[in-house]
């Protein structure tokens, strides 16, 4: 059974949840830990001879130590590159929190030191007309890792996301500052200082923008900027 399970969310879509997750997995592997990860639902998948494949889920598959089939890591694969609940409707698929919870519990029973479950978009992304993705970590009672893009407006988005997570009865286990774009925001250190003081959770690291780097090499390089001790110390 997975010793530590965390749900990874972001303040928005496109903030780098997958690269942060992969970097955490690489850091855990470097510490001698067995790792698992999954992205239960993914839109924007590509047609391949093996079926629908999502580049984020493939990155997670490459980063884990306990090798698993793709369909176990990404059981709900959707082709349209749009919001998951709309993509599911267009594909004629029913997506519910309980269905995703079932996939996650199936992963949790596998032996590992660390399991990361990556969400889609931000905390309140819809799964259907009645539920949001927040219902999944809520049902599983998972601590949450919050990915914050270091750009204008991120303080407000990070604080609101953390408030929503806690309002749902869950713990923000840590946060990671990420640079999803090359441009560095002005007064970045002031922003980091504010978040470190007011977000109420440990900063696990700040990941730089990597230029002219092979995508496959990024997680291992970025893992050096992380301190994942708060995630694996017990």
From Swiss-Prot:
Keyword Cytoplasm included in the entry's annotation: yes
Transmembrane segments: none
Protein name: ATP-dependent dethiobiotin synthetase BioD
Residues bound to substrate: 43
Binding site for ATP: 14-19, 56, 118-121, 178-179, 208-210
Compartments it resides in: Cytoplasm
Entry keywords, A to Z: ATP-binding, Biotin biosynthesis, Cytoplasm, Ligase, Magnesium, Metal-binding, Nucleotide-binding
Entry-linked PANTHER family: DETHIOBIOTIN SYNTHETASE
Its EC number(s): 6.3.3.3
Main subcellular localisation: cytoplasm
Active site: 39
Family, per entry: Belongs to the dethiobiotin synthetase family.
Quaternary state and interactors: Homodimer.
GO MF annotation list: ATP binding; dethiobiotin synthase activity; magnesium ion binding
UniProt cross-references to Gene3D superfamilies, sorted A to Z: P-loop containing nucleotide triphosphate hydrolases
Pathway listed: Cofactor biosynthesis; biotin biosynthesis; biotin from 7,8-diaminononanoate: step 1/2
Reactions mediated catalytically: (7R,8S)-7,8-diammoniononanoate + CO2 + ATP = (4R,5S)-dethiobiotin + ADP + phosphate + 3 H(+)
Entry-linked HAMAP family: BioD
């Amino acid at each position: 059974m997975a010793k530590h399970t965390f749900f990874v969310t972001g303040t928005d879509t496109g903030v780098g949840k997958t690269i942060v997750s992969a970097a955490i997995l690489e850091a855990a592997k470097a510490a001698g830990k067995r790792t698992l990860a999954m992205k239960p639902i993914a839109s924007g998948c590509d047609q391949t001879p093996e079926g629908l494949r999502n580049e984020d889920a493939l990155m997670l598959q490459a980063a884990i130590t306990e090798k698993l089939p793709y369909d176990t890591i990404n059981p709900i694969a959707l082709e349209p590159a749009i919001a998951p609940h709309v993509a599911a409707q267009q594909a004629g698929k029913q997506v519910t929190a309980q269905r995703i919870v079932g996939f996650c519990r199936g992963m949790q029973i596998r032996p590992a030191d660390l399991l990361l479950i990556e969400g889609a978009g931000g905390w309140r992304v819809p799964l259907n007309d009645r539920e949001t993705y927040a219902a999944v970590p809520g049902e599983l009672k998972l601590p949450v890792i919050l990915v914050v893009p270091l750009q204008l407006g991120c303080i407000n988005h990070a604080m609101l996301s953390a408030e929503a997570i806690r309002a749902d009865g869950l713990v923000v286990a840590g946060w990671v500052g990420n640079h999803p774009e090359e441009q560095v925001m002005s007064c970045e250190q002031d922003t980091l200082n504010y978040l470190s003081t007011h977000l109420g959770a440990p900063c696990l690291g700040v990941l730089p923008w990597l230029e002219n780097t092979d995508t496959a090499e990024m997680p291992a390089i970025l893992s050096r900027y992380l301190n994942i001790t708060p995630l694996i110390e017990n």
